[in-house]
Amino acid sequence: MNSLLMITACLVLFGTVWSEKGYLVHEDTGCRYKCTFSGENSYCDKECKSQGGDSGICQSKACYCQGLPEDTKTWPLIGKLCGRK
């Protein structure tokens, strides 16, 4: 019984360690996906899920995602400063 509990705990931990989180970013401009209302946000949730994430919220006027695939690019992008030179 104890070993089953340990295996289950390890699998849960493995899922949280290997998933990414961060602000969604437009790769062509380096700008974050904008949103208006902080907290739960259907637009951000939809955009995050379309990128393979588990969920999304609006935080600091930008879409913040949880559970993104490892290869998903998040803000900031090196060399892309969102309109700044």
Swiss-Prot record:
PTM-bearing positions, type Cysteine amide: C82
Domain named LCN-type CS-alpha/beta: residues: 20-83
GO MF annotation, one: toxin activity
Tissue specificity remark: Expressed by the venom gland.
Pfam families in UniProt: Toxin_3
GO BP terms, alphabetized: defense response
GO cellular component entries: extracellular region
Signal peptide (residue range): 1-19
InterPro entries: LCN-type_CS_alpha_beta_dom, Scorpion_toxin-like, Scorpion_toxin-like_sf, Scorpion_toxinL, Scorpion_toxinL/defensin
Keywords: Amidation, Disulfide bond, Ion channel impairing toxin, Neurotoxin, Secreted, Signal, Toxin, Voltage-gated sodium channel impairing toxin
Localisation per UniProt entry: Secreted
UniProt main location, coarse: secreted
Positions of disulphide bridges: C31-C82, C35-C58, C44-C63, C48-C65
Family: Belongs to the long (4 C-C) scorpion toxin superfamily. Sodium channel inhibitor family. Beta subfamily.
Record text about domains: Has the structural arrangement of an alpha-helix connected to antiparallel beta-sheets by disulfide bonds (CS-alpha/beta).
Function statement: Beta toxins bind voltage-independently at site-4 of sodium channels (Nav) and shift the voltage of activation toward more negative potentials thereby affecting sodium channel activation and promoting spontaneous and repetitive firing.
Protein name: Toxin CsE8
